[in-house]
From Swiss-Prot:
Pseudokinase which, in complex with CAB39/MO25 (CAB39/MO25alpha or CAB39L/MO25beta), binds to and activates STK11/LKB1. Adopts a closed conformation typical of active protein kinases and binds STK11/LKB1 as a pseudosubstrate, promoting conformational change of STK11/LKB1 in an active conformation. One of its GO terms (cellular component) is nucleus. Belongs to the protein kinase superfamily. STE Ser/Thr protein kinase family. STE20 subfamily. One of its GO terms (biological process) is protein export from nucleus. It holds the Pfam family Pkinase. This is STE20-related kinase adapter protein alpha. It comes from Macaca fascicularis (Crab-eating macaque). The lineage of its organism: Eukaryota, Metazoa, Chordata, Craniata, Vertebrata.
Amino acid sequence: MSFLTNDASSESIASFSKQEVMSSFLPEGGCYELLTVIGKGFEDLMTVNLARYKPTGEYVTVRRINLGACSNEMVTFLQGELHVSKLFNHPNIVPYRATFIADNELWVVTSFMAYGSAKDLICTHFMDGMNELAIAYILQGVLKALDYIHHMGYVHRSVKASHILISLDGKVYLSGLRSNLSMISHGQRQRVVHDFPKYSVKVLPWLSPEVLQQNLQGYDAKSDIYSVGITACELANGHVPFKDMPATQMLLEKLNGTVPCLLDTSTIPAEELTMSPSRSVANSGLSDSLTTSTPRPSNGDSPSHPYHRTFSPYFHHFVEQCLQPNPDARPSASTLLNHSFFKQIKRRASEALPELLRPVTPITNFESSQSQDHSGIFGLVTNLEELEVDDWEF
């Protein structure tokens, strides 16, 4: 593997970052007080810090990437991310507040998301899945972002719960811009693309069959719609389909037409729903892929099956449409936004989501912490330890 020199990598990235036009924060390292490390990533070359923006006292996240250790391929990858971050401007896409070079590190500054990611929520509070209305609000925000991305001529290629971030005011943001791929070549929009996502091991369960096949037929924006369907199952069931399955078996399952489903009274046999929860298993719609259910209290005396619930026919149909094996049979993001599944939405996400996410408490209210006294930060760090920040791609 060839590596750029420190000067070469910094100069290459700087051509993108020093002309930051989207920045609402100053692109200077001295303006940010790094408080604590909350994650690592990008082949261990990236450190994620909680930081305080000194001019306003606002808490932000700062991704610092060691450019001196990056290969040529990694630098090109990062350049693509920065280009997309400047190109995109949408209320449901995570905005980059500043990007700049400091001491041979690429710094990427974004607002701190007080509710974390949707994956954090299902891992820490909604282990058996979220309620349907909350999912509707979240997926509506994701589809609005995807509709914009697709109209801009890009494929996202990394839609999953950990790339859906929720702010303090209940707004939904799609992140993971690093994996976006342009379908424009020489000024013309291509019908399909063939590039396989780099550094994609963690996203394999969400990828569509046509992306995994890596054949001459290629794939297009409809591959993101498949990922939306998988993400819907992830949010509703509390786990992602195909989890822990070997890549080759996963590919075979998808190519053979195995379609995951929502786990409820319409998809789980009645005899399983009446079993003792410790003995019952719920088939997620995948052959040989069983998920052991866990006891939950019911009326204070006997445990009930965690999936003894019924999602609406509209939600089931929505997921079925997204997971059509034939990409041409999947609706576009704009078409899905008009699906009956979203008719249950009556308010803005910013008004409804904080209520629907109770008893989750957003990580916030540390304004009283002074620059020399970070006692309030210790509580924040404790809460952050529960979040899977490594998976956040801001």
